[in-house]
Swiss-Prot record:
Keyword list, A-Z: Ribonucleoprotein, Ribosomal protein
Gene field: rpl31e
Gene3D superfamilies xref list: 3.10.440.10
HAMAP family: Ribosomal_eL31
Alphabetized CDD domains for the sequence: Ribosomal_L31e
Homology family: Belongs to the eukaryotic ribosomal protein eL31 family.
The name this protein goes by in its record: Large ribosomal subunit protein eL31
Top-level taxon in the UniProt lineage: Archaea
InterPro entries: Ribosomal_eL31, Ribosomal_eL31_CS, Ribosomal_eL31_dom_sf
GO CC annotation: cytosolic large ribosomal subunit
Record flagged with keyword Ribosomal protein: yes
Amino acid sequence: MSAEFDERVMTVPLRDVLAESKGQRADKAMSLVRSHLAQHFNVEEDAVRLDPSINEAVWERGRSKPPSELRVRAARFEEEGEAVVEAETA
C-alpha cells in the first residue's frame, strides 16, 4: 500500500434497475454498483473488487427485488502501480 489511500462510505442508488425486466434486475444492480464506484473513484470497472457481502445484500430478496439503494464502504489504493478499489457493505 502506498500513501495514497482513499476510503469513503457512499450510498449507491439502484433505482435505475426498475427499468430492467424482472429477471435481470439483480444482475443489473451488481453492474450498477461496479460502474458507480468506478466513476466516483476514477478507475476502470475492471479495477473494482466487490466483497461477497455486496452480492448477498443485492440478492437477499431475490433476483427481481434488489434494494433501491445500497450503503457501501469503498477504499482506493495503488497495487502494483495500478489503482484498485475494494468495496464492502457499510
